[in-house]
From Swiss-Prot:
Designated name of the protein: Peroxisomal membrane protein PEX14
GO molecular function, one term: signaling receptor binding
Species: Mus musculus (Mouse)
Role according to the record: Component of the PEX13-PEX14 docking complex, a translocon channel that specifically mediates the import of peroxisomal cargo proteins bound to PEX5 receptor. The PEX13-PEX14 docking complex forms a large import pore which can be opened to a diameter of about 9 nm. Mechanistically, PEX5 receptor along with cargo proteins associates with the PEX14 subunit of the PEX13-PEX14 docking complex in the cytosol, leading to the insertion of the receptor into the organelle membrane with the concomitant translocation of the cargo into the peroxisome matrix.
Family according to the record: Belongs to the peroxin-14 family.
Segments in the Cytoplasmic topological domain: 128-376
Subunit structure: Interacts with PEX13; forming the PEX13-PEX14 docking complex. Interacts with PEX5 (via WxxxF/Y motifs). Interacts with PEX19. Interacts with tubulin.
Length: 376
């Protein structure tokens, strides 16, 4: 018990020497009282108890108070022999014995059963893996061979089917490739032909355009030449009173009308306007020439008159064309309508034929007058 009490006292602070006048500490005194009241401590001598308490840091006053409160100051053990210092006895150390429950036997039995079961399972596996194949090896081999043969036959059938399917798919793919190649070749041929046709069409169009440009340029040149250069001078005109006319031929007016309407081009009115005055001034000279000229000379005179009339008509046509060209300067030459031009030419020709008829009628009048003078 002294050792236990000593273990309880290590936390108590030790008082420094020379601190006797310090106020007694109640908790230390209380612990000292408990220590002194212990039965084993009470059997020890008083000096040893005091020395132990001083070692724990208690002063003499605190020790006296502890003895008074514990009531052990008068206790004095009976001396049995020589005084020997009392040493606190420690209890002997006992070794712990293993705990043996009552069901240990059942555990032993269970472990034995588990071991036996493992051994039996091992023997069973050895028998199943090694002994049975030796005993029943022929049967198993036959069954395995039969199974392998069946699986091989199934595999061969499936392989044959897959091969046929692959062959059919390859044939279809080859056919599709051939068709695609044909289509590609056709498209390439069509493209080549289209390129060739487009190139030829482009060349032809360019040629046509060039021709049209050249024609337009030529027309422009002609128009400019007509405007720049003066018209060609006409042949000298013969007055109508000098033209020989046969008096005895009654069919001459009809012949003249026939030639004027069919062979003679449009004529002008210049020769006709000058011929009547001259005929009126010299009717006798005209009659004299009629009697002097022969039939051949009369025919030549008529032809000369026709040529003069044609020249005059051509001059008037050129003047009219110049006027029309001046009116059409702002119009594009390429957009001229051919039908309008033909209509204008026809109208000009009709007007020229009417002028020729008028000239012929005017030429007939002196012939009739001369015939009347001859008859008189």
């Amino acid at each position: 018990m002294a050792s236990s009490e000593q273990a309880e006292q290590p936390n108590q602070p030790s008082s420094p020497p020379g601190s006797e006048n310090v106020v007694p500490r109640e908790p230390l005194i209380a612990t000292a009282v408990k220590f002194l009241q212990n039965s084993r401590v009470r059997q020890s001598p008083l000096a040893t108890r005091r020395a132990f308490l001083k070692k724990k840091g208690l002063t003499d006053e605190e020790i006296d108070l502890a003895f008074q409160q514990s009531g052990t100051a008068a206790d004095e053990p009976s001396p049995l022999g020589p005084a020997t210092p009392v040493v606190p006895v420690q209890p002997p150390h006992l070794t712990p014995q293993p705990y043996s429950p009552r069901g240990s036997r059942w555990r032993d039995y269970g472990a034995l059963a588990i071991i036996m079961a493992g051994i039996a399972f091992g023997f069973h596996q050895l028998y199943k893996r090694y002994l049975l194949p030796l005993i029943l090896g022929g049967r198993e081999d036959r069954k395995q061979l039969e199974r392998m043969a069946a699986s091989l036959s199934e595999l061969s059938g499936t392989v044959a089917q897959t091969v046929t399917q692959v062959q059919t798919t390859l044939a279809s793919v080859q056919e599709l490739l051939r068709q695609q190649q044909q289509k590609v070749q056709e498209l390439a041929h069509e493209l080549a032909t289209a390129k060739a046709t487009t190139s030829t069409n482009w060349i032809l169009e360019s040629q046509n355009i060039n021709e049209l440009k050249s024609e337009i340029n030529s027309l422009k040149g002609l128009l400019l030449n007509r405007r720049q250069f003066p018209p060609s001078p006409s042949a000298p005109k013969i007055p109508s009173w000098q033209i020989p006319v046969k008096s005895s031929s009654p069919s001459s007016p009809a012949a003249v009308n026939h030639h004027s309407s069919s062979d003679i081009s449009p004529v002008s009115n210049e020769s006709t306007s000058s011929s009547p005055g001259k005929d009126s001034h010299s009717p006798e000279g005209s009659t004299a020439t009629y009697h002097l000229l022969g039939p051949q000379e009369e025919g030549e005179g008529v032809l000369d008159v026709k040529g003069q009339v044609r020249m005059e008509v051509q001059g008037e046509e050129e003047k009219r064309e110049d006027k029309e060209d001046e009116d059409d300067e702002d119009d594009d030459v390429s957009h001229v309508d051919e039908e309008d031009v033909l209509g204008v030419q026809r109208e000009d020709r009709r007007g020229g034929d009417g002028q020729i008829n008028e000239q012929v009628e005017k030429l007939r009048r002196p012939e009739g007058a001369s015939n009347e003078t001859e008859r008189d």
